[in-house]
Regions:
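Conserved C-terminal structural/oligomerization subdomain of aldehyde/semialdehyde dehydrogenase
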Residues: 37-40, 201, 225, 262, ...
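Glycine-rich loop-to-alpha-helix module at the N-terminal edge of alpha/beta enzyme cores
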Residues: 37-126, 137
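Rossmann-like NAD(P) dinucleotide-binding subdomain of oxidoreductase/dehydrogenase enzymes
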Residues: 128-273, 399
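Residue-level signal for inorganic ion chemistry
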Residues: 36, 72, 94, 116, ...
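Structural signal for hydrophobic packing residues in well-ordered secondary-structure cores
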Residues: 61, 65, 80-87, 91, ...
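ALDH superfamily catalytic-core signature
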Residues: 235-379, 402-403, 442, 492-493, ...
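Short, well-ordered beta-strand elements within core beta-sheets of diverse protein domains
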Residues: 39-45, 60-66, 152, 261-264, ...
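Hydrophobic face of amphipathic alpha-helices that form TPR/SEL1-like repeat modules
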Residues: 1-34, 357
């Protein structure tokens, strides 16, 4: 790997294959959330720099789209090998800038690596369809062709996985790409981009700019950008979808969530409790697919003390420390927001079963730590239920029947993920049929599909009809062209002028 992205050097822009020092006057700190140490600074690119990145991508598209599909596949094969080789180093940087544990950082990278592996089979994924002799001597076939320059806007919570959801599949399809990583933790993302260059991605095919709303808006409105992929908050995702859509872009916008885990009394108790605690408090609750609501059904209401006892055992510490279960949240601002929501839950009458507000971590006293926090007695009008908390806070609601649980989940505006814990096949089938959520786990707490499928959040969690990775994203990053052809022999009989719409 080149020294241009050595950890803890200031972030640079990537334009036309060159790492560029930004000429901006606006720089932001990249802060270790466990220590408040400033690791590096990230520039907010100027308008001219954003335009230069897009122009480089537009120029590169003219040749990249003609690159044989086998050559693109071989670059993906090299990239996945390089990611494996450097994964531990990347995970160390990711943990330092984002706060998650080393093991979780490695998982972040691995789940993205799976998408790169799937991109290695782009030759079969991008094939069109063919129908022979649809009319006399007439054949019809489709071509899946790249659409042009695509943009990706990624969040802080998965600085490896989500960029890898985007740019590998986009460029494997023959497009070029402009990536805007999160300004809060871009260093590990840049390490992955460096590996993409080392794997053979040509100059201009992959570009990187940093910034805030101005850069986001530029990507959404520039004439040469044909598609925008976004993962992040509902507020920003709605803005991106509306703005880019008004400017004629394809848009996929993955947004907020309120994921419910429904627990029936016949579920395997130990496995279920472990799953709930891991999915609720892992990554400090900063996952768009985190379990944030536990719905205890019928006799499962008696499980609350066990849930509390297990959550109390989790170790809160810096992500770099061995044995850590829960690291810090990303920033002081995020911590204050979560603390405010906890306070609102108390004021609105929920029962605070486990209070993580005043936790102290020796050696990391300045860290953005919140311990596992558990509420019971929660109602659907409380802020801790209606808002996405994005912190280590789990709320418990009790109902009497599975039908009531399904109605509860379906009444929530979000539709990212849900899970049912049961030993009953009949209950599982009923749940998966009647639930109005895009991704369903049966005894699986975080049902994020593997890349052979696609990420299929729904309702208030997603705007756009095609999701990231899998077959859907190949559709998103390609244009279908349908060709209908007829070839005549020299001795073909001329049927004269055909003034009808029928082929003959």
């Amino acid at each position: 790997m080149n020294v241009s992205t050595t950890p803890y050097q200031n972030a640079r822009l990537l334009i036309d294959g060159e790492w560029v020092e930004s000429q901006t006057t606006e720089w932001h700190d990249i802060i270790n959330p466990a220590t408040q140490q400033v690791l590096a600074k990230v520039p907010f690119a100027t308008a001219a720099e954003v335009n230069a990145a897009i122009a480089a991508a537009q120029r590169a598209f003219q040749t990249w789209k003609l690159t044989p599909i086998g050559a693109r596949m071989r670059i993906m094969l090299k990239l996945q090998a390089l990611i494996r080789e450097h994964s531990k180093r990347i995970a160390t940087v990711l943990s330092a800038e984002q706060g998650k544990t080393i093991a979780d950082a490695e998982g972040d990278i691995f789940r993205g690596l799976e998408v790169v592996e799937h991109a290695c089979s782009i030759g079969t994924l991008q094939m069109g369809e063919f129908a022979e002799n649809v009319a006399g001597g007439v054949d019809t076939y489709t071509l899946r062709q790249p659409i042009g320059v695509c943009a990706g806007i990624t969040p802080f919570n998965f600085p490896a996985m989500i960029p890898l959801w985007m740019f590998p599949m986009a460029i494997a399809c023959g497009n070029t790409f402009v990536l805007k990583p999160s300004e809060q933790d871009p260093l590990s993302t840049l390490m992955l981009v460096e590996l993409a260059l080392e794997a053979g991605v040509p100059p201009g095919v992959l570009n990187v700019v940093h910034g805030g709303k101005d850069v986001v808006d530029a990507l959404c409105t520039h004439t040469d950008i044909k598609a925008v992929s976004f993962v992040g908050s509902t507020a920003v995702g709605t803005h991106v979808y509306d703005l880019a859509g008004r400017h004629g872009k394809r848009v996929q916008s993955m947004m907020g969530a309120k994921n419910h885990a429904v627990v029936l009394a016949d579920a395997n108790r130990e496995q279920t409790l472990n799953a709930l605690v891991g999915a609720g408090f892992g990554a400090s609750g900063q996952r768009c697919m985190a379990t944030s609501v536990v719905v205890l059904v019928g006799a499962a209401k008696k499980w609350l003390p066990d849930l509390k006892a297990l959550a109390q055992k989790l170790k809160v510490n810096a992500g770099s420390e061995a044995g850590t279960d829960v690291g810090p949240v990303i920033s002081r601002r995020a911590k204050e927001r979560v603390l405010g929501l906890i306070e609102s839950g108390i004021k609105e009458g929920a029962v605070l079963e486990l209070d993580g507000r005043n936790i102290k971590v020796p050696g990391f006293e300045q860290g953005n730590f919140i311990g596992p926090t558990l509420f019971s007695g929660v109602t659907t009008d409380m802020q801790i239920y209606t808002q996405e908390i994005f912190g280590p806070v789990l709320v418990v609601i009790e109902v009497d029947t599975l039908d009531q649980a399904i109605a509860l989940v379906n009444a929530n505006p979000f539709g990212n993920g849900t899970g049912l814990f049961t030993q009953s096949g009949a209950a599982a089938r009923k749940f998966q049929t009647e639930i109005d959520v895009g991704q369903v786990g049966i005894n699986i707490p975080i049902p994020v599909p593997v890349p052979f499928f696609s990420f299929t959040g729904s309702r208030g969690s997603k705007l756009g009809d095609l999701g990231p990775y899998g077959k859907q994203v190949v559709q998103f990053y390609t244009q279908t062209k349908t060709v209908t052809s007829r070839w005549f022999d020299d001795d073909s009989v001329n049927d004269g002028v055909n003034t009808t719409i029928n082929l003959r």
